[in-house]
Regions:
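Regulatory, non-catalytic segments
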Residues: 120-129
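Major-groove DNA-recognition helix of helix-turn-helix-type DNA-binding domains
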Residues: 134
């Protein structure tokens, strides 16, 4: 049986976010973009055959908006990692354990998943993270504490970390 895919686009104080998923869970979510179209374009061609259903994503939307209001949110969302590798899933789940307002290094994530020395592979897995914010890759920093590697750009990474620190 074919899975009915759904999507919605909504506005946040940081920009427009698109959610994409099914009853199996949230499969993709964009970082905030300047326009709804830019946000939808990041999902890819899959969105063309999906059903627009804002109500389906109401829980996700409410949690994301609370996050941008500075609430300490541990996202409680059913996720669908699709065809991700076991390593990617382990990295993403380890990233989800980093608390609001905290950071961890790539090598720290590698140690958490019992793969010391795999910091670069952790970076690759995070670069392919389809669920930023939910899988908070913005909380991953360099071993020296510097901001590095973030698909949303350094300005967005810094803004998200600043939002979380200001809410501590």
């Amino acid at each position: 049986m074919t899975q009915v895919m759904k999507y919605t686009v909504f506005s946040t104080p940081f920009g427009w976010i698109t959610c994409f998923g099914s009853v199996k869970g949230l499969k993709k979510m964009t970082l905030p973009q300047l326009s709804p179209q830019q946000s939808m374009d990041l999902i890819g061609e899959e969105i063309d055959s999906a059903e627009h259903d804002p109500d389906f994503f109401n829980d996700v939307i409410q949690q994301v908006l609370a996050y941008f209001d500075g609430e300490e949110i541990a996202f409680n969302v059913k996720l669908d990692y699709g065809d991700a590798t076991p390593f990617q899933k382990a990295v993403w789940e380890a990233a989800r354990t980093i608390s609001f307002g905290q950071t961890e290094s790539y090598s720290g994530i590698a140690r958490r998943i019992n793969k010391p020395g795999a910091a670069r592979a952790v970076g690759t897995a995070l670069r392919n993270n389809p669920l930023p914010l939910i899988v908070p890759c913005h909380r991953i920093i360099g071993a020296d504490g510097g901001l590095c590697g973030f698909g949303g750009g350094f300005a967005m990474k810094e803004a998200l970390l600043t939002l979380e620190k200001a809410s501590d």
